[in-house]
Amino acid sequence: MTRPRVFIDGEAGTTGLQIRARLSGRTDLELLSIDPARRKDPQARAELLNAANVSILCLHDDAAREAVALTTNPEARLLDASTAHRVHPEWVFGFPELSAQQPDRIRAARYVANPGCYSTGAIALLAPLTAAGLLSADFPVSIQGYSGYTGGGRALVDAHEKGEAHPMRGPFLSYALGLGHKHIPETMRYGGLSRTPIFTPNVGAWAQGMTVTIPLHLSDLGVSAQALHGALTAHYAGQKYVRVAAMESNPEILDPQTLNGTNDLDLFVYASQDGERAVLAARLDNLGKGAGGAAVQNLNLMLGLPDA
């Protein structure tokens, strides 16, 4: 039986390297590789994009759009890890846990957009609550994200690990303070929001691992923390990779690095003693469920392969 062929366009980048490492020991698929000297050659890329059953795009947005244009074989499928197509109407959003129907949509799709790391955590917390009517679409949501430096791409990785100059090299920095981070559109679309949230991302001097938090005044919502927890628990019941912690066993300290090297996503609901305030929290590996792990999960669905 012929093994499906997979090409990683952009395998030298942070996400591409992670995906290749996760796939390199697999015997149920064939990894196609490009000559390193020709990795930016459109003709060489086009040959592999059209020869592969699925190509994973680990590229900047413009290069990802170029890859789509280069893929002329109607049987060739694309899984895009960039921001370029996440809210595009012809692309299926690659968060299988979004709904009961989402895995089948991914299986059938020619084009799948891998979610962003911050938005994975935010959507995982928001989508079940807006779907259940516990959080209105126009509620003023505030989101904070805290990521290791690998979330900033190859240049920031080199700045921390090789001492190269970079404006975001430092022990802890807040950024995107113009409130226009690129993960906001997908967070709104798939988190069920009509009102633009305030999102403030932060990057620290650890390599990988992230948390995403959403503080809420429960009196403004008219619901209890227990109701929010119940909706999340019901939505993710039976999921392999997403877990909702029991409120009584919440850790007092959330270490963003706990899930490094996994495709897991942990969700928490914290509540004040007076029941007036809550914090929703998500913890994941920004290179795992936030990037490479999610891509492999989606790839397995697209190819009909066992979830490894």
From Swiss-Prot:
Keyword check for Metal-binding: no
Entries under InterPro entries matching the protein: AGPR_AS, AGPR_type-2, NAD(P)-bd_dom_sf, NAGSA_dehydrogenase, Semialdehyde_DH_NAD-bd
Pfam families, per the entry: Semialdhyde_dhC_1
Gene Ontology cellular component list: cytoplasm
Superkingdom of the source species: Bacteria
Intracellular or extracellular location(s): Cytoplasm
Protein's organism: Deinococcus deserti (strain DSM 17065 / CIP 109153 / LMG 22923 / VCD115)
GO MF terms held by the record: N-acetyl-gamma-glutamyl-phosphate reductase activity; NAD binding
Pathway note: Amino-acid biosynthesis; L-arginine biosynthesis; N(2)-acetyl-L-ornithine from L-glutamate: step 3/4
Job description of the protein: Catalyzes the NADPH-dependent reduction of N-acetyl-5-glutamyl phosphate to yield N-acetyl-L-glutamate 5-semialdehyde.
Database matches in NCBIfam families: argC_other
GO biological process entries: L-arginine biosynthetic process
Active site: C117
Reactions performed catalytically: N-acetyl-L-glutamate 5-semialdehyde + phosphate + NADP(+) = N-acetyl-L-glutamyl 5-phosphate + NADPH + H(+)
Primary location: cytoplasm
Keywords: Amino-acid biosynthesis, Arginine biosynthesis, Cytoplasm, NADP, Oxidoreductase
Protein name as it appears in the record: N-acetyl-gamma-glutamyl-phosphate reductase
Cystine connections: none
EC code: 1.2.1.38
Family of the protein in this entry: Belongs to the NAGSA dehydrogenase family. Type 2 subfamily.
Keyword Oxidoreductase attached: yes
GN (gene name): argC
